[in-house]
UniProtKB/Swiss-Prot annotation:
Function: Specifically methylates the N4 position of cytidine in position 1402 (C1402) of 16S rRNA.
Class in the EC hierarchy, top level: transferase
A GO MF term: rRNA (cytosine-N4-)-methyltransferase activity
Keywords in alphabetical order: Cytoplasm, Methyltransferase, rRNA processing, S-adenosyl-L-methionine, Transferase
Protein family according to the UniProt entry: Belongs to the methyltransferase superfamily. RsmH family.
Reactions catalysed according to its record: cytidine(1402) in 16S rRNA + S-adenosyl-L-methionine = N(4)-methylcytidine(1402) in 16S rRNA + S-adenosyl-L-homocysteine + H(+)
Name the record gives this protein: Ribosomal RNA small subunit methyltransferase H
A biological-process GO annotation: rRNA base methylation
Xref: Pfam families: Methyltransf_5
Native source organism of the sequence: Shewanella sediminis (strain HAW-EB3)
HAMAP family in alphabetical order: 16SrRNA_methyltr_H
Entry annotated with the keyword Cytoplasm: yes
């Protein structure tokens, strides 16, 4: 059972699961299990012959999945959602998946547990790995990264306007003392920040950028979206929650690209039917944002956006 201290509220829960248009005997993927909120809701809608396959690379999420150990309809894979298609193919289920749910947010237990190193508000080791059993930590990367590389990461993944200034200050400070704690890095950024945004900690963008880079999040998202499209059955649904503009732009462009199909040069002798074959998705409704009531209950839902699409006939 999860401790109250690290409890997690799933964002846009009702809307996301409704977007899957669940069939009682369908097969569904929760590509970002987290602490199981969305999975629990999906299971409520499945009959005894339905099936839910969850994926997560966080060992703590895998442990949390024990809550469903007695449910024969549920199984979980320890791995990144970017490998979603591979896991489904290994199970012999390619083209048979009725819905894929992806929630790209960092879970509240990850943010609130100082030992995970994601938060600039709680002091802890500067880690930030989604799977803290492998890979380079944020502290290791900051210790070795060139100024130009840091500036590029901060600007590209955090949309940080002062990326070069912050990178130079980090490089100067690490010569004296290495950055090993989240508070050390957050305090430096707060001290040197030129443009303070209202209601936003000065370190927000830099911490986001480092986390995205360390975990290859945007590459994982791209692979997950393409993978989901490749495994969905005709009329299968894709429900995707993003939390910042970089993610949402990727999802929006992905859906739009596959709704429009391939671009055909003017005058090429090709039929409308042939053009339609390249249209693989149709968008379902407009982007959905949380209600005021949900944001009041869970302030972390504020920036979330849900987009839904449906797989067309092959």
């Amino acid at each position: 059972m999860m401790s109250q201290e690290f409890a997690h509220l799933s964002v846009l829960l009702t809307e996301t699961v409704a977007g899957l248009n669940i069939k009682e005997d369908g097969i569904y993927i929760d590509g970002t299990f987290g602490r199981g909120g969305h999975s629990r809701e999906v299971l409520k809608h499945l009959g005894e012959n339905g099936r839910l396959i969850a994926i997560d690379r966080d060992p703590q999420a895998i442990a949390a999945a024990e809550q469903f150990a007695d449910d024969a309809r549920f199984s979980i894979v320890h791995g990144g959602f970017g490998q979603l298609a591979t896991y489904v193919e290994d199970l012999g289920l390619k083209g048979k998946i009725d819905g894929v749910l992806l929630d790209f947010g960092v879970s509240s237990p990850q943010l609130d547990d100082a030992e995970r190193g994601f938060s600039f508000l709680r002091d802890g080791p500067l880690d930030m790995r989604m799977d803290n059993s492998q890979g380079e930590t944020a502290a290791d990367w900051i210790a070795r990264a060139e100024i130009e590389d840091m500036a590029w990461v901060f600007k590209t993944y955090g949309e940080e306007k002062n990326s070069r200034h912050i990178a130079r200050c980090i490089a100067a400070d690490r010569e004296k003392t290495p950055f090993l704690r989240t508070k050390e890095l957050a305090d430096l950024i707060a001290r040197i920040s030129k443009n303070k945004e209202r209601n936003k900690h000065p370190a927000t963008r830099v911490f986001q950028a480092i986390r995205i880079y360390i975990n290859s999040e945007l590459e994982q998202i791209d692979q997950a979206l393409e993978g989901a499209l490749s495994v969905l059955a005709p009329h299968g649904r894709l429900s995707v929650i993003s939390f910042h503009s970089l993610e949402d732009r990727m999802v929006k462009r992905f859906i739009r690209r596959h709704c429009q199909g391939e671009s055909v040069p003017h005058g090429l002798p090709i039929t409308e039917a042939e053009i339609n074959k390249s249209r693989l998705l149709k968008g379902i409704g407009k982007a959905i944002k949380p209600s005021e009531e949900e944001v009041e209950r869970n302030t972390r839902a504020r920036s979330s956006v849900l987009r839904i699409a449906e797989r067309l006939e092959y």
